[in-house]
From Swiss-Prot:
Residues 6-123 form the Response regulatory domain. It is found in: Cytoplasm. It comes from Rhizobium meliloti (strain 1021) (Ensifer meliloti). R.meliloti does not have a group 2 operon. This is Protein-glutamate methylesterase/protein-glutamine glutaminase of group 1 operon.
Length: 349
């Protein structure tokens, strides 16, 4: 049996430190070894305690969590889980933190929340098991300029991508390979509900295609990428004559809403062999069954390989199910999607 994950909790609120510590200490596989109220205390605690994982508040006095995270990643890389308020400002800072190299993020409890930090323990344990990879330097920096796709072919394909932990860096890496006239692309990324709008805005600034948070009824168009809104509804595609987004208020699937499986299932039914399915880094198994359905429908399917995953969970389950046709390093996935889109000539029936 492995030793419990050793965690340092950093937050300027004593109440929040106590709540996070109580939630984590309730798990027998986790031990909170220390607490810190600001970056200076945290720096000393990291040196003295050498924790496996740090939970870090975004907003702190003197040096904020984003600045401190940057120092950690440059000087002493380790898994860090960001704890953020569910506000637009908090979301923007969290997206920036995930780009810098934070392992994952959780939202602070809202009034009336009966299960605060319900996913935090699982994320801490996954972080402790992971070997943090600097995808920013190993993959994103090597991305070549995007190559345009034939417009006549781009509109006949639908690309569907699913991701979870590590997905912010992974999606930036993939989408920066896409040209302005990429095939219509739909994405489900597990993320708190207030964060996806900021993430879509960030992707839109960084990438050649237009990236937007999906809205109900939005028609799928060449050169556009649609990101499922977090937390409240599932993203599907429907209407073969004029494919568009549909947001549905169904119960969580695999513990997630939106669910990657729900998206993949709908794309398999709508597009079949004219779809391209991709499963990226993430915890759990969401998306594996849906990717298998895509492959059985004739779609090409790709999975991120273990070496470049922050968490080789979703891609591993998909691969073991036989859902993944080809495993690829993250830096090659965007280019392979475009090659596949250019090669397949069939239209949606």
């Amino acid at each position: 049996m492995s030793a419990p994950a050793r965690v340092l909790v950093v937050d300027d609120s004593a109440t929040m430190r106590g709540l996070i510590s109580a939630v984590l200490n309730a798990d027998p596989d986790i031990t909170v070894v220390g607490q810190a109220a600001d970056a200076l205390e945290a720096r000393q605690a990291i040196k003295q305690l050498d924790p496996d994982v740090v939970t870090l508040d975004i907003e702190m006095p003197n040096m904020n969590g984003l600045e401190f995270l940057d120092k950690i990643m440059r000087l002493r890389p380790m898994p860090v889980i960001m704890v953020s308020t569910l506000t637009h400002r908090g979301a923007e800072a969290t997206i920036a933190a995930l780009e810098i190299g934070a392992f994952d993020c959780v939202g602070k409890p809202q009034p009336g929340d009966t299960h605060p930090f319900r996913d935090l323990a699982d994320k801490v344990k996954a972080a402790a098991r992971s070997q943090r990879k600097s995808m920013i330097t190993s993959n994103r920096a090597a991305a070549p300029a995007a190559t345009a796709v034939s417009d006549s072919r781009a509109g006949r394909k639908i690309v569907a991508i699913g991701a979870s932990t590590g997905g912010v860096e992974a999606l930036i890496t993939v989408l920066q390979k896409f040209p302005a006239n990429c095939p219509p692309t739909v994405i489900t990324q597990h993320m708190p509900h207030t964060f996806t709008k900021s993430f879509a805005e960030r992707l839109n600034r960084l990438c050649a295609p237009t990236v937007q948070e999906a809205t109900d009824g939005a028609r799928l168009e060449v050169g556009r990428v649609y990101l499922a809104p977090g937390g409240e509804r599932h993203l599907e595609v429907h209407n073969a004559a004029a494919p568009c987004c549909r947001l549905v208020d169904h119960p969580p699937v695999n513990g997630h809403r939106p669910s990657v499986d729900v998206l993949f299932d709908s794309v398999a039914e709508l597009a079949g062999r004219n779809a391209i399915g991709v499963i990226l880094t993430g915890m759990g198994r969401d998306g594996a069954a849906g990717l298998l359905k895509l492959r059985h429908a004739g779609a090409r399917t790709f999975g991120q390989n273990e070496k470049t995953c922050v968490v080789y969970g979703m891609p591993r389950v998909a691969y073991e199910l036989g859902a993944v046709e080809t495993q690829l390093p993250l830096g090659s996935i965007g280019e392979e999607i475009l090659k596949t889109a250019a090669a397949r000539k069939e239209g949606i029936e």
